[in-house]
Amino acid sequence: MKRVLSVAAALFCLAACSPEQGDAVSKAASDTVQTLTSMDGKISISVHNSHFTDIIADSARHPKNVPASNLILLQHDPEARITIYVANNGPAQTDAKTYFAELKTALQSDETQNVRVGIATDNRMNYQTDREDRQGTFNQYCIAIHEANIYTVCAYSHHASQKELSEVLKELSLSR
């Protein structure tokens, strides 16, 4: 009888403990970090719990108005339905303050989309755009980087919110 009780107690304990252990494993497994690195090695983006795959070879998926020769990263997460790209726009022709002022003016003059421009730092400025097209609202969150070269890093989607897009680019680093 004691043996039956101790086996029952052990099974009860196991049953009570298993979900917590399973949850711990699930949380650890689900908190993965994927690091996306541009072809030139200058830009890295660490994204939590993502499934991005390289699509740069698929020219049909290249962002409009970005020359293929400038693209140095193009990744898509089919589960989140978010695409990220990095473009190297060549050597900086002006100082950062002038570049960001000109970029802000150019963005705000485009009346086909809603634009929100963030405050520029020494070498970065973020901005958001959204516009309606035949698929619905197209959201884009970008970070312009002014270094020796000018980089544009953007996340875009017809399905993700601006907040979700900004979260994807939250851990962006630049190697100098």
Regions found by a protein language model. Give the residues of each.
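Conserved polar/disulfide-associated segments of primarily extracytoplasmic proteins
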Residues: 58-151
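Intrinsic disorder/low-complexity segments enriched in polar/small residues
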Residues: 3, 21-22, 35, 112-114, ...
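Short, flexible helical or helix-coil boundary motifs
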Residues: 12, 107-110, 176
